[in-house]
Structure formats: C-alpha cells, structure tokens
Amino acid sequence: MDRMQSSATYRRSFKLSVLCAGIAFFTTSSLAAGSDLMQSASQITATGLAKQQDLPSLTGESAEPALARVPDSLTINQAVQRAIQWHPDIAEAVGKLLEQADQVDVAKAKYYPQISGGMNNGYSNSYSEKGYSPSFVLSVSQMLYDFGKVSSSVRSAEAGVAQQQANVLVSIDTVAHDTAAALVQVQGYQQLVKIAQEQLSALMKIGDLARQRNNEGAASLSDATQTDARIEGARTVLTQYQANLDRWRATLATYLGWPLVKKVSDDFPASLARSCDAAKSDDRTIPAVLAAWAQANEAQAKLDNANAQMLPTISLEPQVTHYLNNHYASSETLDRTQYSAWVKVEMPLYQGGGMTASRNAAANALTAANAAVNSARLKARQQLNESQSQSQSLALSLAIQARQQRLGEKTQELYQDQYLQLGTRPLLDVLNLSLIHI
C-alpha cells in the first residue's frame, strides 16, 4: 500500500517537473531583447513598443539527431527531440513564418521604382481620322516621400515575422510539453504495473500459505477464501493499470509518429528536476509573452500607417507613350514616341470617414495588444507560482510517503511473523496491510 502511494505521489511530482520545465524550456535560446522588455506593466506605452522590434531567435544549442526507428528503451530527451523534428504542428508554424517573412519583402518593394507597361485602345475627340489611335505606354512611379507609409508597413510586416517566430516557439513548447507529459504518464504506469504485479505475487504466496494451513487444520477456510478474494481484486487493479499503460503508450506513439512505443526509460534529466526553483519568470524566454510583444509592435505600426495615410505622398512619375498610327493629336508636329515626367503630390481629401475609422480601429487594436502583453506576463507568473507551490507540497509528501513505506514494510514483516509463528495476528490484518489502494 505504501509503495503504491509513494509511486503515485512520485508520478505526480514527475509530471509537475515537466510542467515547470516548460516554463523555462527555451532558456538557452539566443533572444535579442532590449531593455524595454523589462518594463513593468504600468510602463508599457505605444511609444516604447515602436522604438525597438525584438525578434526571438530560432537558433540555439544543437540537439541530437532525431531517432528514425523505435528504440528498445526511449528516454524523455529522445522523445522530445523526435516529436519536435517530426510533428506537423511545428511544420505548419514554420510554414507560416516563411510566408510572413516574404511579406516583409513585399512591403520593402514599395521603396523601389514601380514599373508598368500596357496598351491603350480607345477613341478621343482630340484624335483625327475617327479619333482612334492605339498606343503602348511604359510608366514608372518612384516614391520620394510618403510620411512613413512604407516604413510603417515594413515595421508591421517585421512585427508579424516576430510574432510568427514566437508562435513557432509556442508550438515547439506545446509539443515538447505534451510529449514529455505523455512519457511521464507511461513511466508512472510502468511503475504501477510493476508494483501491482509484485503485490499480486505476494498475495498469491499468502493464499498458498493460507490453503496449506487450512489443510493442516491450523487455519479456517475463511482465511483462504478471503485471500482468494483479495487476489482477484489485485488482478483487477493490475488489468486497469495495464490498460492505462497501453493507452498512454499509444498516445505517446501518436506524438512521435511511430506505430508503437516499446519500453520507456525511467530516467529523468537532472536539469529538469529543479525547474520550478526559478526566482521569477523571464519574459525573454516565454514564447507566449514574445508573441504578445510582437503583436503590440504590429498594432503600433498599423496605427502609424493609419496616421500616415491621411498625409500627402510625393512621387516621381515618368512615362513613355508610343503611338501605333498617326491619328493622335498634333501628329503633324509631334513624334510617335512621346515622353513626360512630373512630380506628383497626392493626398486624400474625403473618404467618407473611412480613414478616421481605420485610425480609431488601429488605436483600439493597440490598446488591446498592450493588455494582451500584460495578460501573457501575468499568466506566465501565475503558472510558475502555482507550479512552485505544488512542487514544494509534493516534495514534502514524497518525504512523508518514504517514511510511511519504511514503517509499512517493518509492520508487514512483524504481522507475517505474528501470523505464521505465534498465531496472534489474524490473516485479515496481513491482507489489509498488503492491499493496493488506488
């Protein structure tokens, strides 16, 4: 009984260690973070967010190659590495990151000349001979100054890249945690099955002894009957544990992309054993917080862009037109190929209130993004505090269970001696002490 309780407590503590490790899982990542990341919640401002764009790095310590085949004994590190390098959720997140990275090039392209060509076909009363004169047109538009329209679009796209990078880390973190948690469940049920088998074997020995004593007239038939009932109960518990073990093995195999998982090693990395001992959470190592910061930077860039849209855009507009016949205006004095270039200043005067509404929407989105940053930081700290409290409680419980186990083993030996040699202890006491409690 005490071994079972100790094993169950150990399994819960084991699982909690993985949860705590998830909070600090990417401590070794190279994260280029500025000082404004360490601002308190009350100091988060739109201006501060716009000053620097911090991109979380996806490069870190090199991991061991992922296993291509199912090993005979799977460790937690091997399982996590295999899941990270195989899982489709991570591949999906990386694909979205590459897509967003291309959006940065799309935004930067507006800094360069925009060249277009085409053909005009139409009638005009300024043309002779029925007013028809088709022409080829080549035009170039080069933005000279736009009050931050393009630059804010670039910052918005770069913030989107930062957010997708953080989302990749979130996906990796989630897959790693879920895989490790499933493996810990397998470890726990492997131990429970082993203990249940030992318990069943011990009860069967007691049953053989009870039947022998009954045959010799030293004990009643009820002792053997009670033992048989306990044996069947132990078989039921063993069957339940084995079913749960098979279920968690199947779950783990799904995370790893394998048809099955054989034996799981009971070893646990020492580096994760004290993961909950961090004094405080570091925002630069928490993917969810990084994603919230990037979202706030993107919202700030969109607000700047909305304001810039209400200001003029100055551009250089050269154009070449080549007419295909002589019916164009002033064809007697002008060559078929005509050139023009002008500096264009354009700004919206009235758009039905749409631009003002867009600016207000961007401002509200920025307010929501700032709140999301605070929420992500608060949630991370809350999870760490809860995990630390549970870790301390389970560590104390493990120590108590270890003492109970030692006392229980001594008591069991004493009860067996009193039953077998002195006859002063009833068999029911021996059975109760050997009973498995779930």
Model-derived features: positions:
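Amphipathic alpha-helical coiled-coil segments
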Residues: 92-107, 171, 175-195, 205-207, ...
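Bacterial Sec-pathway N-terminal export signals of envelope proteins
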Residues: 32-116, 218, 256-300, 311, ...
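Gram-negative bacterial Sec-dependent N-terminal signal peptides
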Residues: 2-31
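Small/polar (Gly/Ser/Thr/Ala-rich) solvent-exposed segments
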Residues: 91, 114-131, 144-170, 290, ...
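Periplasmic alpha-helical coiled-coil/stalk elements that build and connect Gram-negative outer-membrane
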Residues: 2-7, 40-43, 171-287, 387-390, ...
